[in-house]
């Protein structure tokens, strides 16, 4: 029997079992011009390549990209200083400015002073539209319990002006670095709350996702765990991790990505950067705001105490809890 991949809730392909070989073939087809009959058949089966009107920013030689600030103004200040020291020409944020941490309003002036170019994550979409929940994409009751506590706190501590500003942010950006075009999204090009984990994102699927969205690299966040994969086609996928909380590895640093033009027009240099910051000051502020002690423990220990149920088996096996 052919290897099968299950993809649920896919806007393009629907919920079904798809032979792995079909993904490889579709990825190859999406990357080149097709005769009309074959193009029609591929479009019927997989959907047309995405015609994206998003303007392309740049070109840049080097950019810094973060995701999931989660109200961590200490880490954001550290990022802006570190990115400038490393020669980044622009700083991008892939959304989720609030949540988890204290005093989300402290993030806004730092973003503006630092010229950070942000997009909407699920938090921005929900806060700007007055949604009742964060639309995080969790299915487990415990995950949803802590997500609700986090969202309610953030909702109460964001001014109407901040929420309205969130609603003006684009949902995606396209950026040229060297000779490569990058697509910046929150969860995935398909859904703001899709989790792209390293262990459950097969190469053929990523190839097809990049080909259909006509980009050389996809940069995303949402999972809170950083990873980078160079695909056989030369395309790349980078999950930049989270700036707002540790990566569930027992380290108190947080993570962001530096993306630079490499040697040759078609090359990228990607560096996933661990970033120290004053995590003890953040923990003290969280306690002063009476945020859940489980959140504080994560900041101080580097290990997640919540949002564990969403993790795939390999990522969960690396957890302490």
Model-based region annotation:
Residues 7-110, 114:
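N-terminal active-site segment of His-dependent metallophosphoesterases
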Residues 9, 13, 19-27, 32-47, ...:
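Acidic, His/Gly-rich catalytic cores of divalent-metal-dependent hydrolytic chemistry
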Residues 58, 83-87, 177, 211-214, ...:
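Glycine-rich phosphate-binding loop signature in dinucleotide/nucleotide-binding domains
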Residues 66-67, 91-96, 100, 117-122, ...:
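Active-site neighborhood of phospho(di)ester-bond hydrolases with catalytic His/Asp-centered motifs
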Residues 70-77, 99-102, 123-129, 190, ...:
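Active-site environment of divalent metal-dependent phosphoester hydrolases
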Residues 75, 97-114, 127-139, 195, ...:
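Metal-dependent catalytic neighborhoods of phosphoester/phosphodiester hydrolases
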Residues 113-174, 196, 200-217:
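Active-site neighborhood of divalent metal-dependent phosphoester bond hydrolases
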Residues 203-231, 235-243:
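Anionic-ligand binding region
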């Amino acid at each position: 029997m052919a290897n099968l991949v299950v993809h649920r809730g896919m806007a393009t392909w629907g919920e079904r079992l798809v032979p792995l070989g079909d993904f490889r073939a579709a990825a190859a087809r999406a990357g080149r011009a097709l005769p009309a009959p074959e193009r029609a058949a591929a479009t019927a089966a997989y959907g047309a390549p995405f015609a994206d009107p998003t303007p392309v920013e740049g070109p840049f030689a080097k950019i810094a990209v973060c995701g999931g600030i989660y109200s961590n103004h200490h880490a954001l200040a550290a990022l802006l200083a570190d990115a400038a020291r490393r020669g980044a020409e622009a700083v991008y944020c892939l959304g989720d400015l609030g949540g988890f941490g204290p005093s989300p309003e402290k993030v806004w002036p730092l973003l503006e002073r630092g010229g950070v170019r942000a997009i909407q994550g699920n938090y921005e979409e929900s806060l700007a539209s007055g949604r009742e929940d964060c639309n995080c994409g969790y299915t487990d009751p415990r995950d949803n319990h802590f997500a609700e506590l986090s969202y309610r706190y953030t909702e109460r501590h964001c001014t109407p002006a901040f929420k309205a500003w969130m609603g003006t942010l684009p949902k995606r950006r396209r950026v040229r670095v060297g000779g490569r075009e990058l697509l910046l999204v929150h969860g995935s090009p398909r859904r703001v709350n899709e989790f792209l984990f390293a262990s459950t994102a097969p190469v053929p699927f990523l190839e097809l996702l990049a080909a259909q969205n006509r980009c050389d690299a996809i940069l995303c966040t949402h999972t809170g765990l950083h990873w980078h994969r160079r695909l056989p086609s030369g395309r790349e996928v980078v999950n930049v991790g989270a700036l707002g909380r540790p990566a569930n590895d027992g380290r108190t640093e947080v993570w962001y990505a530096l993306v630079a033009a490499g040697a040759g027009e078609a090359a990228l240099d990607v560096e996933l950067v661990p970033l120290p910051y004053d995590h003890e000051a953040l923990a003290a502020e969280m306690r002063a705001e009476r945020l859940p002690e489980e959140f504080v423990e994560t900041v101080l220990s580097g290990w997640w105490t919540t949002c564990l149920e969403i993790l795939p088996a390999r990522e969960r096996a690396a957890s302490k809890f």
